[in-house]
Amino acid sequence: MEQKELDFFLEENLHTGRIHPSKSPMAAPVFFIKKKDGSLQLVQDYRVLNFMTVKNKYPLLLISELVLQLRGAKYFTKLDVCWDFNNVHIKPGDEWKVAFQTNRGLFEPLVMFFEMTNSPATFQTMMNNIFRDLIAEGIMVVYLDDILIFTRTEEEHAKAIRQVLQVL
């Protein structure tokens, strides 16, 4: 079962250009975890690399701040962005640093994987920059790959949803 999942992961990510073969002098091991639905998920074990990495301290939204922003809102829409971390490219030339080793060979990701310590902060920064104007208008908040649109009236809500979807 694990071999089948590994082969699927490698084939899909090689095909989509998210990874390529590597000759890196270092590599992280991989293992599988069982997800809630019983399926397996491949995990790159970047604990050693993450320990040595300078941490990006970009703040994530605090729940207490979110509650304050939602005051008075009556209409809510939650969107889940399906292109999250795996669409943020790693700086060219740095790919070798995050190589991972499998029984099928050594590979380098060309995009961020969730297990990299700065992935959440980097993705949050990107999302906040993309939606800067709409966040400033007070009609939405972003928490990683979750978007919450909130307004006081139905008319405002329809307009806000259109604005967010145009940006996406």
Label for each model-derived stretch:
Residues 1-168:
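Retroelement reverse transcriptase polymerase core
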